[in-house]
Amino acid sequence: MMDLGLSLGLGLASQGSLTSSTTTTSSPGAGSSSPWAAALNSIVGDVRRDQAAAHAAAAVGVGVGGEEMYQGRASTSPDSAAALSSASGKRERELERSGSGVDDDDGADGAGGRKKLRLSKDQAAVLEECFKTHSTLNPKQKVALANRLGLRPRQVEVWFQNRRARTKLKQTEVDCEYLKRWCERLADENKRLEKELADLRALKAAPSPASASAMQPSSSAAATLTMCPSCRRVATAGAPHQPNHQQCHPKSNTTISSSSTAAAAVAVAGGNVLPSHCQFFPAAAAAADRTSQSTWNAAAPLVTRELF
């Protein structure tokens, strides 16, 4: 690009000089050709200034290495080769001095590149002891520790930053494992509670023994109920006869008379025969009835049941 610009500038310059010479030779006293020559000269000057500015910007952007390479392409002088070899040797020495162990962003030197720091066992042990005592250092402690270990303060600071990051990562892993076990324990507890809830619901849905025992006497009572076919009433076996039942069945009132007749028969069977005069007189019959009643009470009870 620069060669093209130079050739263009030289071509314009030669064209301008040629034009000026022709104009001067053809008509040296003419005033109309002088503005054209001045315009051409101004254009050539502008192009040269632009080329100089572009060359300066390229030199600043490329840097030392790029400038040396450009100079090496432009000219094969021994001075440029010596400068290139010295720059490469300096770079190799810097790489040899830098170790592998701790990332170091050395901002004090102004290089801005990432380097590796190799620590010895003694240096690592001292740094570990200091980290156990203080996880962070103030500037004075940082400088004192760097002077003690033969390091730069920036290297000590970066080592402490990395050590804190590793400690935080380990603590995060421990917390994650603890939370995982706690979640598993909560899941087991939740399953157990769900099982207990299902058992309680099944127990609530099933009939209780108290209700079953309460239903059983009602069934037995229903089995002992009797129905009168005439009055169509249901009554238990031990319930007393109702008045309406007696009205419907006046024949039940003859139970006492039949019982007295049976008592008289028993008395006759026992040898207590009423005399003939007592058979026709009510008083004597009543006395005989009382005597037979006492005999009936003394005898074994006779159970009579009337079926309707």
Curated annotation (Swiss-Prot):
SUPFAM superfamilies for this protein: Homeodomain-like
Main location: nucleus
An annotated Gene Ontology molecular function: sequence-specific DNA binding
Domain of life: Eukaryota
Disordered as annotated region, ranges: 15-36, 71-117
Tissue distribution of the protein: Expressed in seedlings, roots, leaves, nodes, internodes, flowers and embryo.
CC per GO annotation: nucleus
DNA-binding region: 112-171
Region (Leucine-zipper): 170-214
InterPro entries: HD (IPR001356), HD-ZIP_Homeobox_LZ_Class_II (IPR050762), Homeobox_CS (IPR017970), Homeodomain-like_sf (IPR009057), HTH_motif (IPR000047), Leu_zip_homeo (IPR003106)
Location within or outside the cell: Nucleus
One Pfam family of this chain: Homeodomain
Compositional bias ranges of the Low complexity kind: 74-88
Keywords, sorted A to Z: DNA-binding, Homeobox, Nucleus, Transcription, Transcription regulation
UniProt record similarity statement: Belongs to the HD-ZIP homeobox family. Class II subfamily.
Assembly information from the UniProt record: Homodimer. May form a heterodimer with HOX1, HOX3 or HOX7.
Function recorded in the entry: Probable transcription factor that binds to the DNA sequence 5'-CAAT[GC]ATTG-3'.
Family annotation (PANTHER family): HOMEOBOX-LEUCINE ZIPPER PROTEIN HAT14 (PTHR45714), HOMEOBOX-LEUCINE ZIPPER PROTEIN HOX2 (PTHR45714:SF7)
Protein name: Homeobox-leucine zipper protein HOX2
Organism: Oryza sativa subsp. japonica (Rice)
